[in-house]
């Protein structure tokens, strides 16, 4: 593999002392001179191990993977291209050249490594596989793009395209935000197959599947407000309308069968129906405005 002089290998870390040394050494040996490790206040020797293997190590000013990536690219990366991966040795340097090829050829501005193309045994639990596929389908439904593996931590992108994005997630939601921003801003995105390895024994994951999965789903939905307003406001409108109709049906049955009137519940049902219809109309209008804006 030839050296990539204008590529920065970005590795956000937190308590990865068991694996970061091998990760840095592999990329340095492969010809990547600029390996940047952004450490989030590890309790172990992660920074020292990374530095000993030749990495450039900085301590992030905040906390969380998302904040680390934003700070690194904006303040510590001077290269035109960034290759981002986790420091847990689950991603291979053997896939690096294929990740970077679409960028260097000018065919894409953002590249996602598809872990499901070669998912090694033990690399991901069945529960996590189910959650990943569910989130990918949700992304395709809400944002109209099928990129196969939006949660992949192996990314390659131009620094210029990254600076176009509006990012705010501090934790693992950074990958989701980046995928949404690519879809929203029309950033050319390529997906390449990669190998995803199990974590080496003795290393612990920082991922909390239920908590982080919930955060990612909320982020997907929140981002739909500006990227797919018809879905965002429409789903709220349908929920409000259906709730109002359900309450109205109960009030009507009670009045017809038992002669009991529920004035307050009737008002609530009417309010729910009116709000729901207004949200649906607002969603249609917002979607029309967004379409006109994209066409200009």
Predicted feature descriptions by range:
Residues 89-91:
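Acidic metal-phosphate-binding loop of nucleotide-sugar-dependent transferases
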Residues 40, 85-87:
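Active-site acidic Asp-centered loop
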Residues 16-19, 42, 65:
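Donor nucleotide-sugar binding loop of glycosyltransferases
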Residues 1-2, 177-296:
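Hydrophobic helical membrane-anchoring modules
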Residues 58-76, 81-84, 93-172, 176, ...:
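Acceptor/aglycone-binding surface of glycosyltransferases and processive sugar-polymer synthases
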Residues 39-47:
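A conserved acidic beta->alpha catalytic loop
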Residues 1-26:
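N-proximal low-complexity "stem/linker" segments adjacent to membrane-targeting elements
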Residues 25-33:
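Short, acidic, metal-binding catalytic loop of nucleotide-sugar glycosyltransferases
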